[in-house]
Amino acid sequence: MMTEKALPESLTCRISSGFFLSPALHVFNPDTDYALGDGGRFYTPPRIVSRMRRELALFPATYATPGDMILLLDDISRDEMENSPYLAVMEAKRIKAVPLAGLQGLAHSVRSIAPWGWNATLLRILEENNAPATLLPSPERIAGLRELSHRRTTVAFHRLAPTIMPQCASPVPVELTSEDEVMDFCNRNPGCWLKAPWSSSGRGVMHTDDLEERHIRPWARGIIRRQGSVMGEVDRGRKLDFATEWM
């Protein structure tokens, strides 16, 4: 019987109760929030986001398990790979980078596909490159994940928080579905915040302090046309800006 000591170092962490665990296939797609906002299967991200996806393609190596793989959504040259700040950790963990063209050959080699975030465009790309259907979520699952990512989800949290921690009571966000509703909310709550249902990196957020109606209406009109609504939040005089990533 093969013992753990007889295995290559990169595989020893994959022994659990006597079973070998196949590697996970990671995908870095930081454009996922934009793609969720678009909702379609043929979304093209802004150039700056596409560049970030390309430059940080090996970033999953920082949290991947030794022996895992990374799927490259872009054609990355050898020089780009060698200049990546994550190459060293990738080599230390013996993580393999796989181009899209090599996806079909992984049908029996990986246990899961783990993107930065699922969306309809990524699902189409993986399907077109013959990813194993058993590793892909259904279109219905993608639609469900998109709804969970909508900012209206925070309404339930705002209502629940005070029942658990009374000191955390705060004004509940309001979903606004027309320009007139947006302006009425702004007039009743000077200096309020307006937020697109789906956005990323601070984009899609407007602080209305010192802004006139002629600035607010066009912005709200565009968001409502593309995403169906705008979320309104009362300004609370913030003390600190921060964000968290859940892995």
Which positions does each model-derived feature cover?
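Phosphate-binding site of ATP-dependent enzymes
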Residues: 190, 213-247
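Glycine-rich phosphate-binding loop of ATP-grasp-fold ATP-dependent ligases
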Residues: 172-173, 191-216, 243
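Short loop/turn segments at strand-loop or loop-helix junctions that form parts
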Residues: 26-39, 74-75, 117-120, 197
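Conserved N-proximal alpha/beta basic substrate-recognition cap immediately N-terminal to
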Residues: 49-63, 71-184, 200
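Flexible loop/turn segments at secondary-structure boundaries
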Residues: 34-35, 78-81, 200-203, 239-241
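N-terminal-proximal low-complexity accessory segments that begin disordered
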Residues: 7-62
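Generic beta-sheet signal
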Residues: 24-26, 113, 192-194, 230
